[in-house]
Regions:
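Acyl-CoA thioester-binding alpha/beta core of soluble enzymes
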Residues: 1-224
Length: 226
């Protein structure tokens, strides 16, 4: 069954809704995580699209069709894979920097400080004029107007911002810039003759993906392809 999120992806691949309806979703449905966003539907739609593409490629290679099934709960967990990572059966520490997070600012507004990278942490602490201590940071942020703090941190080449409502975000220039972009864009970087796919017993056997992204969203997207 094609979900609303999956339907938005259909035109990108030239798929019909009937084709997308061949996907079999299972497991829990939203809300899975404590958020108003439909993360389960979105993540399962992305993995469903990858599965359909792999199935189509396999059919082109072999003439045989594959079924596509997605567990919504597992698809959601895949976006937080670092939380469940293990090394030799032992959990891998995923502790964030202690000053990273959301803090109350003036006038009932909130500010978010992204401090995982040393340069971003240094920029935020420099603007706030405090040491690396969560209580000290909280007291300092409480003295700031959230928007003014956002502008000061950005000017210091840090990362952070005022927490906005959906309506406020919709009026922001960055929101407009993102809304004008296609969901997916393929940029050809050079010309070459077509190459035959390597032999293998899976749809993408022998195909390699070079991931040049950094931080969170990019590597997560590459993991979905893997």
């Amino acid at each position: 069954m094609a979900t609303d999120a999956l339907k938005t992806l259909l035109p990108l691949a030239g798929w019909s809704e009937d084709h997308a309806n061949t996907v079999e979703p299972s497991g829990n449905f939203d809300p899975i995580l404590p958020t108003p966003f439909r993360i389960g539907e979105t993540s399962s739609a992305a993995l469903s699209a990858v599965g359909l593409a792999a199935s189509d490629l396999w059919e082109l290679r072999t003439g045989r069709h594959q079924d596509v099934a997605v567990d919504v709960r597992q698809a959601t967990a895949s976006l937080r894979s670092s939380n469940y990572m293990k090394m030799e059966e032992a959990p891998v520490s995923n502790r964030r920097n202690e000053v990273m997070g959301v803090y109350p600012a003036k006038n009932g507004r909130w500010s978010y400080l992204h401090c995982n990278f040393p340069n971003h942490r240094a920029a935020a602490l420099s603007v706030l004029g405090v040491a690396e201590d969560r209580d000290a940071v909280a007291k300092a942020v409480a003295q700031w107007d959230a928007l003014e703090l956002e502008e000061a941190i950005i000017a210091a080449k840090g990362a952070g911002g005022m927490v906005r409502t959906m309506e406020e975000w919709g009026q922001h220039p960055q929101s407009a810039a993102i809304a004008s972009l296609p969901l997916l864009e393929i940029v050809k970087i050079g010309d070459s003759p077509p190459e035959k796919l390597p032999e293998g017993d899976r749809p993408l056997s022998g195909v390699r993906v070079l991931d040049l992204t950094r931080v969170l969203a990019g590597p997560t997207l590459s993991l979905i392809h893997i």
